[in-house]
A protein has these predicted regions:
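Interface amphipathic segments
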Residues: 1-379
Length: 379
């Protein structure tokens, strides 16, 4: 190992360091990292840093040292477009400029030691520039980024900040969050003056392969705020949106939804499909009395199979109500009164199934009753 660093003034550090034949060992064995070289230069009011290794290369140049670069990114992005995220005002923009480029190679050895389960594909690249006018442009491209069984394939991220706003567009060929799989995804986030717009589209385009459509178009508007005690809060509502699961189209609409100080309120969140409906109203609070009401009308239980990772053969139609009662209430937990027709599990008929729960105050417990009726025989 060779190292020679000197602080020349303020935040600037110059010098270089070289480490040969790095090998890391853990319970899974030996990880060959190889050589690492870092060089830091400063001149003409520009700081330059170069990182070289077999798993990644990076270059940085800026009118401030890299520690100031991180602070300035906040200044021209989230602090400007979403000021409610911060209690203090922070520092202003000082007409600095920056350029950053990172290119990944085969990083499996170093990631398996420092971040087990993480994978970043060879040739993944990040480029970021900030002009003296505070204009940001950034792009991340990757064939695949994964963590365990979750991954993004064909990822392309674009970020900029025109006219005091912040915009990000994240697209991918494939997004997998077990058990969900979405293809041709496109997520847009836009923020200005604490107002946030979210647009998300996906289309698996598998009708010809499976005979069923799975796609979605979701639209959400939100406003960030702080209450009188400076607690962070958010108010949001769905614009007319839709999602198609196994060719069943669901329309999504809502009035206002709000979360602040460990308390959530939902007004008129509705998921509707021909012949079935889910409505959610009310609230939930960690330290207050409140109740969230969920009403089901002829809900197709087979949709649950899409979210279990395996096909358990669940089927039937559910109608009734569920109440989620906040933990600080006298009767915390879930109250149910559901009637399920033509119910089945694992391919076996269960018939008409009734599920109910009530709170027994003296014993401080829930009593749950589950009865089914098959061809007039009750169990």
């Amino acid at each position: 190992t060779q190292a020679n660093f000197t602080r020349i003034s303020g935040e600037y550090i110059v010098g270089d360091i070289g480490i040969k034949d790095i090998s890391l060992v853990d319970e899974h064995g030996e990880h060959e990292v190889g050589d690492i070289s870092i060089a830091s230069l400063s001149g003409n009011d520009i700081s330059r840093i170069r990182f070289t290794s077999k798993f990644a290369d990076a270059s940085y140049s800026g009118s401030r040292f890299i520690t100031g670069f991180v602070q300035d990114i906040q200044t021209i992005t989230t602090r400007k477009s979403m000021p409610s995220l911060y209690v203090n005002e922070g520092v202003g923009w000082n007409d600095d400029k920056y350029d950053l480029a990172v290119n990944f190679h085969d990083s499996r050895d170093v990631l398996s030691f420092f971040a087990p389960g993480t994978y970043i594909a060879d040739s993944t690249s990040l480029k970021l520039s900030i002009t003296r006018q505070g204009e940001l442009k950034a792009r991340l491209k990757s064939g695949r980024i994964a963590f365990k069984d979750k991954y993004l394939k064909g990822l392309d991220v674009l970020i900029d900040n025109p006219e005091a706003s912040l915009r990000a567009r994240i697209s991918s060929d494939e997004l997998a969050v077990n058990p969900l799989m979405m293809r041709n995804t496109d997520l847009f986030l836009g923020a200005v003056n604490d107002s946030v717009k979210v647009r998300y589209d996906f289309d698996n385009k598998d009708r010809t392969r499976t005979g069923k459509e799975n796609s979605g178009n979701l639209r959400l508007n939100a406003v960030l705020f702080r209450d009188g005690d400076l607690n962070q809060g958010i108010r949001a509502s769905f614009l007319p949106s839709r999602i198609v699961l196994d060719s069943e189209k669901w329309d999504i609409v809502s009035n206002e939804m709000q979360y602040c100080a460990d308390k959530a309120m939902i007004s008129g969140l509705n998921f509707s499909s021909p012949g079935q409906d889910i409505s959610i109203d009310g609230g939930w609070a960690a330290n207050d009395n409140d109740t969230l009401n969920i009403a089901l009308s002829q809900f197709d239980l087979s949709l649950i199979n899409n979210f279990t990772g395996q096909d358990y053969g669940i089927r039937g139609r559910a109608t009734g109500k569920a109440m989620l009662i906040s933990p600080s209430s006298d009767r915390p937990g879930i109250l149910l009164n559901l009637l399920c027709d033509s119910t089945g599990f694992a391919g076996r008929p269960v018939g008409r199934l009734r599920v109910a729960s009530v709170w027994e105050g003296e014993a401080q417990k829930f009593n749950v009753v589950c009865r089914n009726d098959i061809d007039g025989v009750r169990t």
